[in-house]
C-alpha cells in the first residue's frame, strides 16, 4: 500500500502510529498542540495500564461488537466471512462507532496528527502531558462516568481524569 500525497505514512507502514493519528485527528481536530498531545497521551497511558489492551490500535478500537445484518442473515456462512461492526455508543472513542467514514481527509490537521503520533510513539515527545490520565471528555459535555473519576485538569478543549 502506497502513502497518499500529503500523508507521512500509512496504516501498513506504521500501523500503531496510524491508529494513534486517527484518534488524535477525530478526537481533537481543531484543538491546540497541547490538547492533541494530551488526547494522545491518554491512549499511551491506557497501553501502559493492565486494565486496557496492550497496543495502541487495540486501545483505539476497543468496543463492543455486533454482527452486521449483511452476514447475520446467512446461518451457514463460515465464521471467517462474517462481518462485525462496533455498537454505537459502546466504543472507547466515539468517532470509531459513529457510523461515519474513518478515512481522514488529507490536509494540515491530518499531517499534524500524524506528526504528533509518530513523535509520541517513537520518542518521549510530550509523553506525560496528561499527567497519567486514562479518560477525557470534551469541555462541552458532562458524561455520567466522570463522577467516579479523579479530575486531573483541563488541557485545550478536553477535561482529563484518572480512575480513583
Enumerate the predicted regions with their spans.
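Bacterial extracytoplasmic/cell-wall-associated proteins, especially those involved in peptidoglycan
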Residues: 2-164
Amino acid at each position: 500500500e502506497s502513502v497518499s500525497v500529503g500523508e507521512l505514512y500509512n496504516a501498513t507502514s506504521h500501523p500503531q502510529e496510524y491508529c494513534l493519528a486517527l484518534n488524535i485527528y477525530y478526537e481533537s481536530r481543531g484543538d491546540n498542540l497541547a490538547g492533541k498531545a494530551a488526547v494522545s497521551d491518554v491512549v499511551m497511558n491506557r497501553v501502559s495500564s493492565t486494565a486496557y489492551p496492550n497496543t495502541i490500535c487495540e486501545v483505539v478500537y476497543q468496543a463492543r461488537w455486533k454482527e452486521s445484518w449483511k452476514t447475520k442473515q446467512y446461518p451457514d456462512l463460515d465464521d471467517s466471512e462474517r462481518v462485525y461492526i462496533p455498537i454505537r455508543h459502546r466504543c472507547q472513542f466515539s468517532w470509531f462507532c459513529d457510523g461515519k467514514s474513518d478515512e481522514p481527509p488529507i490536509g494540515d490537521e491530518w499531517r499534524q496528527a500524524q506528526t504528533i503520533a509518530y513523535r509520541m510513539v517513537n520518542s518521549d515527545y510530550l509523553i506525560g502531558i496528561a499527567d497519567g490520565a486514562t479518560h477525557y471528555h470534551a469541555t462541552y459535555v458532562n458524561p455520567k462516568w466522570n463522577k467516579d473519576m479523579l479530575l486531573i485538569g483541563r488541557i485545550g478543549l478536553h477535561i482529563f481524569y484518572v480512575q480513583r
